[in-house]
Structures are given as C-alpha cells and as structure tokens.
C-alpha cells in the first residue's frame, strides 16, 4: 500500500455521507464513522463489516446499503479491489441511492481486470451524470485493455524482484545516483521501525530501506536506511539530488485521534548515514498534502504531487525551482493532470517524465505513463506504457537503470492490496543484415569488401569472411545503400529499408560479383525461337545489367552471344551476332553510353566449359569438361539437349576498367 496523502481531501468529500450514517445511534456504527472520518480505513473496514453482518437484510435494507457503500470505500482505499466490488454490489442491491456506487463499482471491477462488467457499471453511472469525464476515461481504458490483451505481445520482460519484497508492501524504488549500485525503496515490512500498526493500512508504518550491489554486481540483503531517517511515522517515496548527497522524502505524521499531515522533507548524506530530515517549505498552505518528490536530473526542479488549490482535480503534479523558489511554483498543466490523481513523478531526463495516474485512460487503478516535453517546452505528449508494465492493479513508482531496464511497483495479483517491487527490461531490438559475397559460380569471393550507408548518417565497412559471409547490425526504420566489391570484380549495389517493427529481424541479401578477367554468363536472357528478338521475361536481367554498368562507370564491356551446334556455322554466327546487338540496343535505350558497349556473335565456336556451378546443377557433366561437338555426340538424347541449353548463352566480357578516367 502506498502512502495515500488524500486523507484530508477525502474527509471533506464524505462529510454529508457520514451525517446520514451518524443519525444511527448504534455505538459500533458511530465508532466506524469516527474511524472512517480520520481515514483509518483498515480499522473502519473491520467495524463496518461487523455492523453490516448484524443488520437485518429485510428490516435494515436502507442502512445496510449505506454501510455496504462505506465498506466498499474502505476496501477501495486499501486497494482490495475484489472486496470493494462485492461491497459496492451489495450497496446497489440494497438500493443505495447515490449513483457514485456504480462509478466506484466500475473502478473496482476495472482494477480486477473485469473490463466488460466495468464498462456496464460506468455506463449506468453515466445515465445519471452523462458528462462525467472520469467515467468516460474509465470506459476508454477498459476498451484499450481489451484490445491490448488481444494484440501483439510486448517485448517487455517483467519479473517479481523477490529480494526486495517482504510479506507486506514494498514500493517506489529509486537509485541513489548514476553509479546505479545502491537502490532505496519504501517498505511496511515487519522489520520497520516502531511497534504500532497503522490504523489506515493495518500494517506497520513504512520506513526507507536500501540495498547495495556487491563486487559481482548482485544486490545485497536490504537494510533499513542508516541515520535518522526512519521513525515511528510513515517515511518513504524518495528522490535524490544529482550528486546523491541530498534526499527528498515524503513524511506522513499523525497524532492519535487526529488528521495526518503529509509533507516533503530533506536529508543530507554523510558517508553512508543520513541526517535528521528537515521540512522542505513549498507554500504557507498547511491544509494541503505534498509528497512523492522527484528531483530533475540537472538539479533545477523538484517535481511533486499535491492536492493544493489551483489544480485540475484530485492530486496534480507540480514543480518548483530549487534555485529560485519564490514565485516558481508551477502546475504541469492539463496534458499531465486530470480530474483524477497524478502521482509518483520520475524524471529520466529533463524533458522525459514518468508518472502514475488514474485519470488518463488506463488498465485499472494507477497506470504508468511516459510524457515527452516538446522542443519549445510548451506541450507534453502523454503515452500509456501498456502491458505488461501496466496491469489492472496499481502500477507506479518507476525508476530506470541501464538502458531500457529498471524497477517499478505494483499490487497486481495481491488480493490484500499490498504493493511489490518488480524488475523490467526491454530487450534491445536486434536488427541485422547478413549474406554472402559470391562469384558467378557461387564460390566465395576472396577479401570482398561490403559497405553500408544509412540515411541516419551511419557508415559501416566489413571484409567478408573466408566463406564469403558477412553481417551488419542495423537500426529500425532506416534506408540503406550497400555496395560489395573486390579486386578483379565489378561492384554490385543494393538498396533496402529496415522496417519499424519492434521485433528482432535478420535481413538477408547476397551479392553475386562478376569477375573482370573472364566472360560472365548473364542468366535469364531469352530470345524468340530462331530470332534475335528479346522476350519480355528478359527485362529483369537486362535492367540489372544496366544497373551494374551504372554502378561501375569506368567499365566497358563486350556482349557476346553463343548458340548450340545445330544449324550451319555461318547461320549460327549471324544469329548470335544479331542477338548480342539486341542486348546492346536495350542497354543503350536504358541510358548506357554506346561507346562503352560492343558486341560479337560467336555462334558455336566457343563451347562452354563446365564450372563447379554447372556441375552442381548437372552432375552428369564433370567439372572442366568442354561441351564441344565430339563430347555431345557421346551423350544420350536427354543429356544432349541439356548440353545444348548450356551452350546457348549470353555473356559479357570486361574490355576496360579505365573508361572516362583520363
């Protein structure tokens, strides 16, 4: 349970209600009313329950409904959502007249994660008060939760930080400084100072505890904060100056049978010990509550939560300039604050605020929100942190350590309403691109160099491994240009864009480099039968060839076409010559300068020599075998057709690498 400093505010809101119940002279009910009026919700819940059980369901229906409503409110204040839901349902069953019973039933059901029944309760309440913004936001939150549960699972990893947790409430963790080796938090463990239980929560009053990492980076056993911090009162919810020498803490003091004062105090550190806290004066207003301090990373501001006048309802987040206090008090405005409660601020950066709220649409109870301040310092953009950071219960008091990891507090899954500390981690989204650099025979290219340039300004270079493989680490949502090359080979360029998905991804791209010193077959160039007309399916291969020439602007080539051995030699020379020229004509039309291109038809005069790649595809042909006429005549009819197909090819040969250089 959290230090709830809304006691004073709540007492005034429920004064009329207590007048009605006060008309009953039953001593036990009068005792319950008095406990409730002082904010002693734990004690009052027990007394109200005893009164409720003795009232007749038939004769005392009206009073039973009123007591059930009060009992529901006690349970709600104790964060015991299932008990609160049952009590409010009893109040409605006994026709309790205040429509707020439906509103609070909706809140309690939402805190249980029963979203559809919660929507129904909110809608019933809106029949009485159709303009109520909190009820509307409650419905929005329920719908958001239903949609989120059906959607993609978040990458966040959330675990119970068992070392820090006791059998009572443990919450609001905070690192001491940038070293991240010491963490402080608030606890109502049985080891807390003092002997008396809190009449408000039924547990011991909270103290400040801490844990330190050992030389192996493991957290040590938690101990009470050293020095004069912990007393018989409630202390906790701390923040620290950037140098870790000043602690800001919340102190709730209560005299017997009296109201509770909630204020911010400061303490100074000397070695490992803390001085006796001194009150931090914010205003002269002594009726309002001030708590949940959060120092900004640059030490300029102290953010805090308060129900002081001038807010937007409930408790708001404010800030005060620590260097110029006079006249610097500032409400963070309606983008942050709502008609509900905004509490537990935490500044990760001077323009990045985290806080808990039950006024913005959420999953139930308090939700954690992230807010960015724009470049002009005039507007906050607020975002719910979503599942699994948020739950149907109370989620609050976050702090960040290294990267996207840290701790926060939640009472999720605890029917008693006790808070516990959880760790969280958002694993880095790993985006990579990998592939191979091979030659036309699909063999690794030695010492190939791959460069990758992103429109985010990144520029990486890597030498392919001996097997031709490479791998780069990338960022999400970036356009990249990659170029692969090696001595004795033409460069190849490829472009792509990584997407924005928050998922690991490994893009794959291979580079096939053409060697300069020998002819290179151009795959997938097709002609009409017995003609030089290029078929439409050749376009992709021809366009890739044009791009290769653009990527290698100092290269000139000869296009060569080859035929099988059917037909006369003269006929085949003529056909292949026309086919080679057709390719050159296409490249010129694609923007390649004509003086970089020549062509020649070889007919059947240069039969293909079997390469490793051809051997893998046609194992019947041994590597280095020349597919000439004498060899082909020894083959079966089927293998002869395969050999003819291999011989029918279009190739290019680099003729110069110095074009237009001088």
What are these regions (language model features)?
Residues 487-510:
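Structured interaction patches on ligand/partner-binding surfaces of diverse proteins
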Residues 357, 361-364, 562-662:
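Periplasmic OmpA-like peptidoglycan-binding domain that tethers envelope proteins to the cell wall
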């Amino acid at each position: 349970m959290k230090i709830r400093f809304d006691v004073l505010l709540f007492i005034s809101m429920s004064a009329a209600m207590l007048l009605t119940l006060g008309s009953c002279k039953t001593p036990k009910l009068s005792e319950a009313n008095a406990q409730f009026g002082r904010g002693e919700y734990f004690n009052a819940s027990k007394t109200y329950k005893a009164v409720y059980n003795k009232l007749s369901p038939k004769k005392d229906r009206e009073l039973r409904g009123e007591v059930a409503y009060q009992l529901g409110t006690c349970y709600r204040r104790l964060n015991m959502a299932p008990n609160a839901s049952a009590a409010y349902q009893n109040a409605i069953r006994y026709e309790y007249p205040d429509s707020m019973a439906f509103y609070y039933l909706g809140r309690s059901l939402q805190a249980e994660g029963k979203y559809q029944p919660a929507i129904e309760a909110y809608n019933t309440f809106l029949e009485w008060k159709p303009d109520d913004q909190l009820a509307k936001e409650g419905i929005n939150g329920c719908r958001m939760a239903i949609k989120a549960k059906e959607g993609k699972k978040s990458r966040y990893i959330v675990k119970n930080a068992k070392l820090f947790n006791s059998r009572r409430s443990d919450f609001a963790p905070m690192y001491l400084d940038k070293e991240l080796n010491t963490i402080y938090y608030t606890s109502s463990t049985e080891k807390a100072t003092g002997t008396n239980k809190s009449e408000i929560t039924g547990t011991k009053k909270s103290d400040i505890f801490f844990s330190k990492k050992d030389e192996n980076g493991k957290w040590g056993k938690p101990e009470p904060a050293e020095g004069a911090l912990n007393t018989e009162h409630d202390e906790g919810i701390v923040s620290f100056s950037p140098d870790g020498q000043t602690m800001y803490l919340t102190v709730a003091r209560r005299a017997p049978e009296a109201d509770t004062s909630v204020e911010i105090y400061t303490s100074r550190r000397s070695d490992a010990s803390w001085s006796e806290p001194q009150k931090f004066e914010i205003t002269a207003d002594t009726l309002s509550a001030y708590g949940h301090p959060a120092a900004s990373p640059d030490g300029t501001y102290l953010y805090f939560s308060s129900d002081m006048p001038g807010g937007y309802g409930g408790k708001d987040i404010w800030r005060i300039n620590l260097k110029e206090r006079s006249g610097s008090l500032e409400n963070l405005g309606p983008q942050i604050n709502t008609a509900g409660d905004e509490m537990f601020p935490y500044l990760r950066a001077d323009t990045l605020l985290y806080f808990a709220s039950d006024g913005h649409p959420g999953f139930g109870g308090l939700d954690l929100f992230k807010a960015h301040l724009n470049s002009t310092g005039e507007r906050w953009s607020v975002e719910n942190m979503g599942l699994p950071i948020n739950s149907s219960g109370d989620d609050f008091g976050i702090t960040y350590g290294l990267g996207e990891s840290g701790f926060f507090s939640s009472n999720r899954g605890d029917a008693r309403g006790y808070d516990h500390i959880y760790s969280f981690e958002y694993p880095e989204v790993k985006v990579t691109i990998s592939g191979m650099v091979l030659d036309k025979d699909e063999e690794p290219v030695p010492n190939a160099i791959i460069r990758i340039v992103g429109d985010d300004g990144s520029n990486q270079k890597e030498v392919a491994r001996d097997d031709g493989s490479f791998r780069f680490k990338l960022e999400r949502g970036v356009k990249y240009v990659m170029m692969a090359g090696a001595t004795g080979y033409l460069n190849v360029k490829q472009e792509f864009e990584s997407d924005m998905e928050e998922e690991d991804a490994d893009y794959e791209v291979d580079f096939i480099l053409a060697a300069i010193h020998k002819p290179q077959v151009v795959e997938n160039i097709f002609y009409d039968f017995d003609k030089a007309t290029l078929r439409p399916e050749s376009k992709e291969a021809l366009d890739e060839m044009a791009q290769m020439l653009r990527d290698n602007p100092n290269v000139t080539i000869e296009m060569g076409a080859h035929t099988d051995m059917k037909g006369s030699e003269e006929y085949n020379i003529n056909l292949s010559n026309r086919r080679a020229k057709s390719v050159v004509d296409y490249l010129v039309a694609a923007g390649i300068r004509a003086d970089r291109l020549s062509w020649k038809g070889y007919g059947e005069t240069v039969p293909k020599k079997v390469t490793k790649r051809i051997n893998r595809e046609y194992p019947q042909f041994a590597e280095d075998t020349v597919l000439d006429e004498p060899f082909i005549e020894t083959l079966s009819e089927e293998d002869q057709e395969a050999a003819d197909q291999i011989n029918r090819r279009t190739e290019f040969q680099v003729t110069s690498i110095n074009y237009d250089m001088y």
